[in-house]
Amino acid sequence: MKPAARRRARECAVQALYSWQISKNDIADVEYQFLAEQDVKDVDITYFRELVGGVATNSAYLDGLMKPYLSRQLEELGQVEKAILRISLFELSKRSDVPYKVAINEGIELAKVFGAEDSHKFVNGVLDKAAPQIRPNRK
């Protein structure tokens, strides 16, 4: 699958996970509704499903990975930033096929698109500290 389709999968995953985090609805329902209502013709649907399902299933684990590197309490973290960090940390910890730098750079780019004004700097700072602990070989 083309990198652009994966990027779109990540963008859609941020939106779906944001909705899930806010609504507390079943993740399968959120995923189904998102795919039914959004234009996803240029999206790697398989990867979107892997991200959404993987992040939802592993959210407590992923939150534990980010907690030591947050400058504030997890509960104070914005929902967009939380979704983005969860996706990037999922890719770093559970998707060895995603290169180290790609997982970090994609997280930063997602924060530029969806986050508040300086959230990309915050996401970069957290990932910059967490990533070497998750993948010491930086591959």
Swiss-Prot record:
- Segments spanning the bilayer are none
Question: Which keywords appear in this protein's UniProt record, sorted alphabetically?
Answer: RNA-binding, Transcription, Transcription antitermination, Transcription regulation
Q: Does the keyword Iron apply?
A: no
Gene3D superfamilies reported for this sequence:
NusB-like
Q: Name one Pfam family in it.
A: NusB
Q: Which residues form a coiled coil?
A: none
Any idea which GO molecular function terms this record carries?
Answer: RNA binding
Q: Name one GO cellular component term.
A: cytosol
Does this entry carry the keyword Transcription? yes
Q: Name one GO biological process term.
A: DNA-templated transcription termination
Q: InterPro entries under this entry?
A: NusB-like_sf (IPR035926), NusB_fam (IPR011605), NusB_RsmB_TIM44 (IPR006027)
Per the entry, what this protein does is: Involved in transcription antitermination. Required for transcription of ribosomal RNA (rRNA) genes. Binds specifically to the boxA antiterminator sequence of the ribosomal RNA (rrn) operons.
Q: Which family does it belong to?
A: Belongs to the NusB family.
The UniProt entry, under NCBIfam families, shows: nusB (TIGR01951)
Full protein name: Transcription antitermination protein NusB
Q: Which organism is it from?
A: Erwinia tasmaniensis (strain DSM 17950 / CFBP 7177 / CIP 109463 / NCPPB 4357 / Et1/99)
Q: Which gene encodes it?
A: nusB
